Amino acid sequence: MDDVAADPSHPRYQSLLLRHRLEQAEQQGLLAGSAMIAHGRGEAYDYLLGEQTIVSAHLATLYALDALKRANHPVLSLNGNAVALAGEALLKLAERLDCPVEINIFYRTPERMEALLGRLEAIKSELNLDVKILGAEPNARIPGLKAVSYTHLTLPTIYSV
C-alpha cells in the first residue's frame, strides 16, 4: 500500500487506512462513485457505537456463517468495496466453504468488471486458492440458485445470548 499521511497514534488510524485503500481502489476502477458514501455511512455507525461490535452484529455474523455452512450451494456475493477491502479474506473463506464467489454489482461497466475480476484472479493466483469466480457474464444464472427465506432457520443455542 502507498504511504498514507496518518499518524498511527490517531484514534481513527485504522479507519484512515481503510479509506486510503478505497481511494486507491477507486483510482484502479474497482468502485462505483457511491462507494465512499456507503463506506462512510458504515463508519458513522461504527463511530456512534463506540468502535465495538455489538452483540446483535456478532450474532448476525455467526448466523450468516452457520447458514453458509448448511447451504447446499453457498455463494459469496461481492461488491467493489468487499473486493477492495477484504478480497483476500473472502477468497480464503470461499475456499474453506468450498463455494464460489460472484461479483454482483449494481453499477456494472465492462471496465469495472474487468478490474474486479482481475483483482480476484490475481489474489487467487498469488495464494494458490481453488475458488471459482463468477460474474463475468452479465446475464448468467447460477443453476439451482433461488432466493431463500431464512425465517425458518433457528440459531444454534451456542450462539444465543
Regions found by a protein language model. Name each.
Residues 7-10, 142, 155:
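Intrinsic-disorder/low-complexity coil detector
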Residues 96-147:
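Long, charge-dense
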Residues 152-161:
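Single conserved hydrophobic/aromatic residue that forms the stacking wall/gate
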